[in-house]
Structures are given as structure tokens and as C-alpha cells.
Curated annotation (Swiss-Prot):
GO terms for molecular function: DNA-binding transcription factor activity, RNA polymerase II-specific; RNA polymerase II cis-regulatory region sequence-specific DNA binding; sequence-specific double-stranded DNA binding; zinc ion binding. It comes from Homo sapiens. Belongs to the GLI C2H2-type zinc-finger protein family. It is found in: Nucleus. The lineage of its organism: Eukaryota, Metazoa, Chordata, Craniata, Vertebrata. This is Zinc finger protein ZIC 5. PROSITE patterns: ZINC_FINGER_C2H2_1 (PS00028), ZINC_FINGER_C2H2_2 (PS50157). Gene3D superfamilies: Classic Zinc Finger. Essential for neural crest development, converting cells from an epidermal fate to a neural crest cell fate. Binds to DNA. Signal peptide: none annotated. PANTHER family: TRANSCRIPTIONAL ACTIVATOR CUBITUS INTERRUPTUS. The modification Phosphoserine is found at S554, S558, S576.
Length: 639
């Protein structure tokens, strides 16, 4: 194992030698060549020539690293270490070499200052000076083969100990990313990052490079460089240079903070806006989230459709979970956004938000509340007022009695309205009169015999249906428990109502169906046709419905015993059958029948039938028994 590079103490080891020894095309995060050509602009070579080993004391991240582009292809898989303070820089080269060796062995002491270089480091606790290494008479060994060049805008630090072996494979190197537009030169010269304006001119030995015109990353301090190199508007004002800081340098931000800002801004813009807005758009307030879209537009400027391999979803989730401790230390919590003003911020109104943000907002959208109004009129007001005058014929809709006003209280749920009416208006068991005083009630003050009947009646006005069907998938609700009880028999198949006639085993789910069936046994025909001139009658309404189809379609080819002519009306035509002339002399055609209830009239049992054919020479009778009910297709005719 060869000794570390820092212990060899070469007389004048320069990074320019390493840069000129092997030149490889720079690669970005995806492993493809750089976006804007070779990142080493014209000032990079000249600036590297003046960089010496002592300049690495304040920025160990610029040191050579065994990591190549293939190790840094995925930035999301590498850990990001928290920030720490930097060692002070000393002019002595041996001491700087010793500190560089100590940084390799103990990586926790390194930091990543924003500016880099000796001018951007602030000593926290100066360590004891290391003893100078004894000079060796032997000539220095040749420099090792240069490693592949690091990524533009990336530096690496050793974040995990692996003993003092110094091997690259036994240590966990952490990728740090400088998000400024001039990352290559600024990291080695201490030049301003992005739009951070610290000094207008550089030193004679280290000239400040011109601002990069194709900046791709936002500044570490939350600013963005303008086209002319001047500082742009502040995107994150809480992260600006602190006035009280020595040298006007801001607090150092580690790579995790910078990557989080860029990814969160890009995710917020892609999720909420779906488009990039100008990075210099005016804002009404620093806390307005329109600045997030501006930051995202600035961060994504110049990338086009290139895949950044950034886990924007994870960054957005982390940003939604809350700011990290480092952000909370430097910036106060953001204020809630102001109410939308269409004249100033028309971009705030997005009815259809794409992606997860739209689904979340649809979930959080409050439902429209339905206002339920109580229209119960106080009976005390009705008692103190004179009776209303009789309505003139024709009666218009009657106004409230005597001008009495209803309760008019509004409620958000049906449960609240029902409780209000029951407790405040209906009253308890002390009430002897059970009268409905709902506005425009058709009962007109007619009382009920019991309180529960009044409560059931009030459901007609309120629309309450408190009895839902318990069977899954049904979804029917009922206002009365008796109706629900009858309905549940359709699911269970229960038929508790047995036919009362001997020898008949028919059963029914409700008593009304059993009553209809009983006419089969009594030979009563209470359901007769209402078409004038047709005297057909039946014992069951289903048979009458089958008969009514004859009046709605063409008759058979021969006139038949019914006496209908061969010319009929098509299906759906008005019910105006053409009867036989012998029968039509004493009958008139009925108008169009539009309601099923007008098709038949249920007569009382034993009532005489008065609709007979005048030409009949005997008593009209029909032998209709159980088989016609069992087979509804069979229609008996009158002879």
C-alpha cells in the first residue's frame, strides 16, 4: 500500500498537472456527455494552474477522489452528510499536507463551505499545529496516475471511517453537489456561487471567472444569477448572507439542503403548475408559493428534455412532510399563502390539478352543504291571529295562515332537523294534540290519534328515510319500518301470508298480494276495462294489463269473437279502437289513456256489472279460475 498523497510532500504539486495528464469528456448524472459541451471553460485551466496544495485546507472537497463518473451515476443512491465547520487554512505547506492526511483518516472534520477556498472558511476551534514533516533527501516519487476527472459541480468527501488504511474501497464516499452555475471554478477559487455577490473583483493571483451564462443549478444561498452576472432576485430570502457574519459569507449549506431545494422546487412546479414560469416574475410576498415555481424554472433552465435522474417524488414528499432541521435553523416557517386575487395572480386558479396533488385536493375539498329549513309554524301565532279569509274561487296557493311566519331555522344534516322538529315543535308525551303545523300541509290542522303517526307524517315534509335496507348492494331506504319489513322479504324469500281458501297453497310476501289473489276463488271480477264499448273484467290486475295490450296493437287477421275490425292502430298509437258498427251505436270512444290507473277500476265484491253488450242475449259470464292466474298468457273472452 502506498502512503497517502499528502505525506509525500511534493515540492510543487499542482492540479493542473493532473488535469493535463489525462483529459476525458465530462459526464453528467445520467452517464452521457455534458449538456453544454466541455465544462472546463477558458478560465478553468488558467485558474487551476495557480491552485496549490495549501488551498485545499479549507475545501477538502476539491481534493482528488478515486470515484469516477460510473460511481456517481445515481445521486439519489448516495448519502448526504450533514454540514460541519471547516478547518482554518494555514500558509504552511507541510501543515496543510498534514491536515489533508488527517482529513483522509478522519473525514468527519471536513465541511463543504459555500464559497470554498481560504476566504470562505471560518475557524471554529483551531486545532493544535501539526509538527512539520522532516525533509527527505530522496527525490519525490513520481505522481500516481491521475484518477478520472470528477463530475462538474460535484465533490466528494470521506464520510465513513475505515481505519487508517486509506483505501478508497474501504471508505464510504459521500457525493456533494454544488448547485451554482459556476461550480467548477467557484469550488477551487472561492468565487461567488451563482448569484452570490461577495466581491466585484478577484485577487490578482486568483482572478474571478466571468459568470456562466448557461447556469443550470440554483445558488446555495437561494439566489439566482442574472444574465449580466449580477445577482438576481432572492428566491429564498431567509438563506441570504447574514449581515453580521464575518466577511459577508452566509451559513454553509450542505449538498442535501441544496438538492432538496432544487428537487422540491421542481416537483412543486411540475405538480401544481405543469409549466415553467419566468424566474424573475414579480411576487407579492416572500412566502407566496409562486416563488417555488420561479425557483423550479430557474433550476430547470437549460435542461430541456434531458433526464436528471432526480427522485422528484421523494423530494416532494420530503418537502411536504416539513422542512428539515437545517432549514428551520436558517429560515422561519413559511406563512400561509394569501387569498387568491384573480387580478394579480391568475395562475392560481387550476380547476384540474394533475397527479397526486389533484387527487389530494379533491380528497380535501369540502362537500357542498345542503341547507335544510324548518317550516314549522308556531301554533301560538296561529291562535292569536284571526282566521284567514276563505280563498276566492279559483283558489290560489294559500299564504301562511294570518301572515304567520315559519321557524325558518337552517340545518346542515337531516338528523339535526329531525331532532329540532321532534324536540322543539312536536313536544313530549305531555302533548295531547298531535297536529302537523308544517307550512302548506294538506291535512289543514287535522290531528293524528298518536304521536308516532305524527312523526311518521312529518317525514313526508322533511324527506327523512331512516330505515335503510341492511342487505349489501341494495341501497334502498324507507320512511316507515313497515315498508322496510315488507321489502326485506324480497331478499329472504319469506312469504308469511298464506291463501285462506282450502286447497290452495299459495303464499305471499304481503297481504295486498294475497287480497288480489283471493278474487280467483270468489270469481269476483273487480278489474274491468275502461275503454268505452269494452266490457271485459278480470279478477287480477295482471290479467287486465295483458288485455290492455290488445287495444294498443293490431288485432289478429280475423275479426274473431271480440267483434274488433281488422283495421287496428299501431303500437303506441292513441287508444281509440274501432269497434263493430253493431256495437258502436250505443257507445262512444274514450280519450287516450295515459295512466295505468285509468285502465281498470276495482269494484267492490258482489257489485253488479253494468257494462254489458246490448246485443248479448244472455247473462255475461266468464269461467276464469286459477289457471288463468298461473298462466297469464291465456286470456278468456266474453261470449
Amino acid at each position: 500500500m502506498e502512503p497517502p498523497l499528502s505525506k509525500r510532500n511534493p515540492p510543487a504539486l499542482r492540479l493542473a498537472d493532473l488535469a493535463t495528464a489525462q483529459v476525458q469528456p465530462l459526464q453528467n448524472m445520467t452517464g452521457f456527455p455534458a449538456l453544454a459541451g466541455p465544462p472546463a471553460h477558458s478560465q478553468l485551466r488558467a485558474a487551476v494552474a495557480h491552485l496549490r496544495l495549501r488551498d485545499l485546507g479549507a475545501d477538502p472537497g476539491v481534493a482528488t477522489t478515486p470515484l469516477g463518473p460510473e460511481h456517481m451515476a445515481q445521486a439519489s443512491t448516495l448519502g448526504l452528510s450533514p454540514p460541519s465547520q471547516a478547518f482554518p487554512a494555514h500558509p504552511e505547506a507541510p501543515a496543510a499536507a498534514a491536515r489533508a492526511a488527517a482529513l483522509v483518516a478522519h473525514p468527519g472534520a471536513g465541511s463543504y463551505p459555500c464559497g470554498g477556498g481560504s476566504s470562505g472558511a471560518q475557524p471554529s476551534a483551531p486545532p493544535p499545529p501539526a509538527p512539520p514533516l522532516p525533509p527527505t533527501p530522496s527525490p519525490p516519487p513520481p505522481p500516481p496516475p491521475p484518477p478520472p476527472p470528477a463530475l462538474s459541480g460535484y465533490t466528494t468527501t470521506n464520510s465513513g471511517g475505515g481505519g487508517s488504511s486509506g483505501k478508497g474501497h474501504s471508505r464510504d464516499f459521500v457525493l456533494r453537489r454544488d448547485l451554482s452555475a459556476t461550480a467548477p471554478a467557484a469550488a477551487m477559487h472561492g468565487a461567488p456561487l451563482g448569484g452570490e455577490q461577495r466581491s466585484g473583483t478577484g485577487s490578482p493571483q486568483h482572478p474571478a471567472p466571468p459568470p456562466h451564462s448557461a447556469g443550470m443549478f440554483i445558488s446555495a444561498s437561494g439566489t439566482y444569477a442574472g444574465p449580466d452576472g449580477s445577482g438576481g432576485p432572492a428566491l429564498f430570502p431567509a438563506l441570504h448572507d447574514t449581515p453580521g457574519a464575518p466577511g459577508g459569507h452566509p451559513h454553509p449549506l450542505n449538498g442535501q439542503m441544496r438538492l432538496g431545494l432544487a428537487a422540491a422546487a421542481a416537483a412543486a412546479a411540475a405538480e401544481l403548475y405543469g409549466r415553467a414560469e419566468p424566474p424573475f416574475a414579480p411576487r407579492s410576498g416572500d412566502a407566496h408559493y409562486g416563488a417555488v415555481a420561479a425557483a423550479a424554472a430557474a433550476a430547470l433552465h437549460g435542461y430541456g428534455a434531458v433526464n436528471l435522474n432526480l427522485n422528484l417524488a421523494a423530494a416532494a414528499a420530503a418537502a411536504a412532510a416539513g422542512p428539515g432541521p437545517h432549514l428551520q435553523h436558517h429560515a422561519p416557517p413559511p406563512a400561509p399563502p394569501p387569498p387568491p386575487a384573480p387580478a394579480q395572480h391568475p395562475h392560481q386558479h387550476h380547476p384540474h390539478l394533475p397527479g397526486a396533488a389533484g387527487a389530494f385536493l379533491r380528497y380535501m375539498r369540502q362537500p357542498i352543504k345542503q341547507e335544510l329549513i324548518c317550516k314549522w309554524i308556531d301554533p301560538d301565532e296561529l291562535a292569536g291571529l284571526p282566521p284567514p279569509p276563505p280563498p276566492p274561487p279559483p283558489p290560489p296557493p294559500p299564504p301562511p295562515a294570518g301572515g304567520a311566519k315559519p321557524c325558518s331555522k337552517t340545518f346542515g344534516t337531516m338528523h339535526e332537523l329531525v331532532n329540532h322538529v321532534t324536540v322543539e315543535h312536536v313536544g313530549g308525551p305531555e302533548q295531547s294534540s298531535h297536529v302537523c303545523f308544517w307550512e302548506d300541509c294538506p291535512r289543514e290542522g287535522k290531528p293524528f290519534k298518536a304521536k308516532y303517526k305524527l312523526i311518521n307524517h312529518i317525514r313526508v315534509h322533511t324527506g327523512e328515510k331512516p330505515f335503510p335496507c341492511p342487505f349489501p348492494g341494495c341501497g334502498k331506504v324507507f320512511a316507515r319500518s313497515e315498508n322496510l319489513k315488507i321489502h326485506k322479504r324480497t331478499h329472504t324469500g319469506e312469504k308469511p301470508f298464506k291463501c285462506e281458501f282450502d286447497g290452495c297453497d299459495r303464499k305471499f310476501a304481503n297481504s295486498s298480494d294475497r287480497k288480489k289473489h283471493s278474487h280467483v276463488h270468489t270469481s269476483d271480477k273487480p278489474y274491468y276495462c275502461k275503454i268505452r264499448g269494452c266490457d271485459k273484467s278480470y279478477t287480477h290486475p295482471s290479467s287486465l294489463r295483458k288485455h290492455m295490450k290488445i287495444h294498443c296493437k293490431s288485432p289478429p287477421p280475423s275479426p274473431g269473437p271480440l267483434g274488433y275490425s281488422s283495421v287496428g292502430t299501431p303500437v303506441g298509437a292513441p287508444l281509440s279502437p274501432v269497434l263493430d258498427p253493431a256495437r258502436s251505436h250505443s257507445s262512444t270512444l274514450s280519450p287516450q289513456v295515459t295512466n295505468l290507473n285509468e285502465w281498470y277500476v276495482c269494484q267492490a265484491s258482489g257489485a253488479p256489472s253494468h257494462l254489458h253488450t246490448p246485443s248479448s242475449n244472455g247473462t255475461t259470464s266468464e269461467t276464469e279460475d286459477e289457471e288463468i292466474y298461473g298462466n297469464p298468457e291465456v286470456v278468456r273472452t266474453i261470449h
